[in-house]
A protein has these predicted regions:
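Short beta-strand to alpha-helix junction loop
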Residues: 75-81, 111-137, 288-294
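Flavin (FAD/FMN) cofactor-binding core of flavoprotein oxidoreductases
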Residues: 296-339
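Active-site substrate-recognition segment that forms the wall
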Residues: 228-236, 240-286, 293, 297-306
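A conserved short coil-to-beta-strand element within the FAD-binding core of flavoproteins
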Residues: 148-170
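N-terminal FAD cofactor-binding segment of flavoenzymes
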Residues: 61-103
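Central helical "cap/lid" subdomain
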Residues: 56, 66, 183-244, 308-310
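N-terminal Rossmann-like FAD-binding beta1-loop-alpha1 element of flavoenzymes
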Residues: 21-49
Length: 356
């Protein structure tokens, strides 16, 4: 693996058996990896397929000439003891970010929230957010169970008979980076741990997926433009940072919803760096814009919020096609036992890392 580093459940109609199952998990983000780990611990054979060349999903981090950026999830909190138990398996990959609370500021950088936010620990991965999913993915990779650079474009299903019983058999049609089109087959169940719109597209490739696809009609997800800015000139004598004294803030600016000083996170390079997320509405309106145009507009908005108007030494933008959950499914997962299909992801109940 590249360690350096993009319906209500249907009524069951088939009986269960105690035999270990062969299960395909599509998507190697937090939800897919957590699902795969749990299934492996239960004794099943699991294979995870990820279209990108690295695991992580929306906890992806990217490297720039002056340090790394968490372009997806910025941090996470722990409110469920079950999630805490999972995190306890990789304690060396986490540190607390010194944000006791996160304030909200207007388009001019002035604080506008009236009440003090709830104070809770904001956790980040070390040396970046992607380190957590990479730690979970490494055992799968070493066991030959994680298949990177393999995009699932369709699924097919048939009923197999054996030992007096019938059971599901699923096949996945893959586009691989190294070997072209391939087929992976012999799966008893398929778990789709991908954004809801992607799940719908895959479910529609097999008639058995129609019920689950229909159940996702009310789920809404929005894109997000992410911008990264580097200011190595702030490392000069007598100058340690640029702009405001705060390190992260939500924003009501018409273009921007989140601003964070990346270099304030523990375990990061100290070169002044900022990560910015555009708000969902603006991102959706400009999802087809040229990246250069988006970069110019977001840089202008960033200057209005922070007062930093000097040109960065390095700047980039990235588009997340399905980044933010606007309307969740309303249940923690969906499972059609009669078809051998399941769905999971943060979009099932919310938009937080813990929801995955």
């Amino acid at each position: 693996m590249n360690a350096s580093r993009t319906p209500a459940s249907a009524t069951a109609t088939s009986s269960t058996t105690s035999r270990p199952r062969r299960i395909a998990v599509i998507g190697a983000g937090i939800a897919g990896l957590a699902c795969a780990r749990t299934l492996l611990q239960a004794g099943h054979e699991v294979h995870v397929y990820e279209r990108l060349t690295q695991a992580g999903g929306r906890m992806r981090s990217v490297s720039g000439p002056y340090g790394s950026f968490d372009i997806g999830a910025q941090f996470f909190t722990v409110r469920d003891p079950r999630f805490q138990k999972v995190l306890d398996t990789t304690p060396g990959n986490l540190r607390a970010w010194s944000l006791n609370n996160i304030q909200t500021r207007n388009a001019h950088g002035r604080r506008i929230d009236k009440l003090a936010p709830v104070r809770e620990t904001h956790w980040v991965g070390i040396p970046d957010m992607q380190s957590l999913p990479l730690a979970w993915a490494t055992p799968l990779w070493e066991a030959g169970k994680l298949h990177l650079g393999q995009s699932v474009r369709a699924m097919s299903h048939h009923i197999a008979n054996g030992k007096g019983q019938s059971h599901h058999q699923w096949s996945l049609m893959l586009d691989t980076e190294d070997h072209g089109p391939q087929i992976a087959d012999g799966f008893d169940c398929v778990v789709l741990a991908v954004p809801a719109p992607v799940a719908v597209q895959l479910l529609q490739t097999a008639p058995q997926g129609a019920a689950l696809a229909k159940s996702l009609a009310t789920v809404e997800m929005a894109p997000c433009w992410a911008m990264t800015l580097s200011y190595p000139m702030a490392a000069q004598a007598g100058l340690s940072t640029l702009g405001p004294q705060w390190n992260a803030s939500r924003s009501t600016h018409e273009r921007i919803s989140w601003v964070a000083r990346e270099s304030s996170k523990p375990g990061r390079a100290q070169t002044e760096r900022w990560t910015i997320h555009a708000n969902p509405l603006w991102s959706n309106e400009h999802r087809h814009d040229d990246a250069t145009r988006v970069l110019s507009k977001l840089q202008k908005a960033f200057g209005e919020i922070t007062g930093i108007r000097v040109a960065p030494r390095h700047a980039s933008v990235y588009l997340w096609q399905n980044a933010q959950t606007l309307a969740p499914l309303g249940q923690s997962f969906a499972y059609d036992r009669s078809a051998g299909l399941a769905l999971c992801g943060d979009w099932c109940t919310g938009a937080r890392v813990e929801d995955a």
